[in-house]
Design a protein with these regions (language model features):
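Basic helix-turn-helix/winged-helix DNA-binding cores
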Residues: 1-82
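Intrinsically disordered, low-complexity, charge-dense segments enriched in Lys/Arg
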Residues: 79-141
């Protein structure tokens, strides 16, 4: 669940990095203050109100953090904006997390299921690649 309180930047960083590290491969790059500032500057997330970020912005940052290794951020932002026209950020976040953790449900929009599966396939491919590299460097016994 997303925090009910509005968060300052340092709290957002801690929360988003904690949540996304649980679902990412070990080579996942942590979210930084500069990244958030750039996302705000480019309109990928709304500006904080009185330096505080709301649930909607935190949910969007989590989605961007998970999806950015596979999809261009501009595309992620465009799709999220389109999805938010039909559902609230909280409903979309819950749908995304539910699919990510449990797989397909009947109410999962196809675009969310394909995006999640693409990220999981990418992570699995990278894991296999690392394993291949590790076996190359093992001495023959």
């Amino acid at each position: 669940d997303l925090p009910d309180l509005e968060l300052y930047l340092d709290q957002v960083l801690l929360y988003v990095n904690q949540v996304t590290q649980l679902s990412q491969a070990t080579d996942h790059k942590l979210l930084t203050a500069s990244m958030i500032n750039n996302y705000v500057k480019h309109g990928y997330i709304d500006k904080p109100i009185k330096k505080k970020y709301q649930k909607k912005q935190v949910a969007r940052l989590i989605a961007i953090s998970i999806l950015k290794n596979v999809f261009p951020i501009q595309d992620i932002s465009q799709v999220l904006t389109s999805l938010q026209a039909a559902s609230s950020s909280e409903v979309l976040y819950d749908t995304f997390v539910n699919y990510w953790n449990n797989g397909l449900t009947q109410s999962t929009p196809e675009i969310i299921s394909y995006a999640c599966q693409t990220v999981k396939d990418y992570q699995h491919t990278m894991k296999l690649s690392r394993e291949m590299e590790d076996t190359k460097h093992e001495p023959n016994l």
